[in-house]
Amino acid sequence: MCIRDRCADEAEKIIALEKISAEGLYTHFAVADCPDDEESVEYTKNQSDFILNVYDILCNRGIKLEHLHFLNSAGACYHNNPRSTLARAGIIMYGLYPNYPVKLPIKVEPVMSLKAVVSQVKKLNNGDSVSYGRTYRADGDNITAATVTVGYADGYSRLLSGKADVLVKGKRCPIIGRICMDQLVLDVSGAGDVKEGEIVTLIGKDGNEEITADELASLYGTIGYEVVCGISKRVPRIYVD
């Protein structure tokens, strides 16, 4: 017995369970986001053919399912199939690329921003240290530091310590010292007159500058999807048109 028949047998057993009301059959593409790799394209085609064959076997056995779906974000863009009744858009809903920097054949724009507030501004003297471990020490007397109300408990990764920038008044300002649970510190010396209560942008646009989830992801070896999904529940969500 081939694996397609075995899968159809298992599906039939599940569908026959008393507490189950089956509406469809689906799979999930593993490498649909690699359109320039021949092996990945072939693998995705085989996945598609496999689920279609299992679906047809079930139909031939008199089992009718309303839905057949296997298209994720990349699949819907590169491997669309008229027999698929649904698409499961994920990362593309955030306006992010499934496999950054590989572009999609459609235009997408990031839709999520992450903002926080400056809670304190102070001047640093030469040799002053910032945050846990004293990993940052001021090199000079003309450095303005701003404490910002966001930290790794909000889902802004501690791995971005000393690596990422934050937008303040349209200027990129580097994170100095280690990111804390509830706050981080910026060098805002190049941002002009920064005051307490100033809104800063950790993800999104401010003036002509933009920081994307993909940019942050590249700084600590992950994907943009993890960055946006990692923002914790305690961060208020504001939905705009």
Residues covered by each model-derived region:
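C-terminal accessory subdomain/extension
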Residues: 123-241
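Proteins enriched for Cys/Gly/acidic motifs involved in redox and nucleic-acid/cofactor modification
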Residues: 1
